[in-house]
Amino acid sequence: MENNYTNNDTETLEEEMFASLEKYFQSQIEKHVINVKVLMKQRVGVAEHPDIMLTIEGELEKIASYSDKVDALELIS
């Protein structure tokens, strides 16, 4: 079984770190986009989220934050 944690010959550790961070940030964006879509489609308040608009706003803030991180990562890569 191949060890996925070792550095291959064509990719430096720095490149691996940038790729990993970008994948993580993108996956977080996708997660929060799905959350917004579910909240907008369901239109039903959840017990711990009685203010649906405030909950959606919170999800949008998270999307914006991770989008900013992707942009910042591109500036330094």
Question: What is each model feature region?
Answer:
Residues 2-77:
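Extended, charge-rich alpha-helical interface modules
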